[in-house]
Amino acid sequence: MKKYYLIVLISFLIFYLSIFLAPYFAYLGETSNFWKFISICLYAVYSLICHQMPQRSFFIFGHKMAVCARCFGIYTGVLVGMIIYPFIKKLDDFKIPNKWYLIIALIPMAVDGTTQLIGLRESFNELRFITGFIAGFTVVFYILPIFFEMIYKKFK
């Protein structure tokens, strides 16, 4: 299982780091068409999974990140959860936690997003990040056991 865990972790780390590469390449693209093209490609890929609204995104290198603040929080939570996962749970333990932990972890993000959507208030990027982080961190403990169990059954 350790081998598969490392493959998943490294793959996700590449995905995560590319969130930072898009604005960095956009910055380099201010003086180079090559880097501008690469950044446009990265933004296009991430546009498939995120709205990328500038007012809901963090900026680095003077350019918005490849995903919005909430998505960035989710992916940061997933990465942190994946890194600490083997310290909390054995990789060959396929039992998932009680569903209520996941529901409770999703409530802050749902409340934040819904209250903004219906116009009760305007959220802010730090809150979007935090609520996304909570959800992303928690979901790891549900998805990885299912994934590892599938791998175990396939290759046992």
UniProtKB/Swiss-Prot annotation:
Segments crossing the lipid bilayer: 6-26, 34-54, 68-88, 100-120, 129-149
UniProt entry tagged with the keyword Transmembrane helix: yes
Membrane topology: Multi-pass membrane protein
Keyword list, A-Z: Cell membrane, Membrane, Transmembrane, Transmembrane helix
Protein location: Cell membrane
GO cellular component, one term: plasma membrane
InterPro entries: DUF2085_TM
The keyword Transmembrane appears for this protein: yes
Protein name: Uncharacterized protein MJ1492
Primary site of residence: membrane
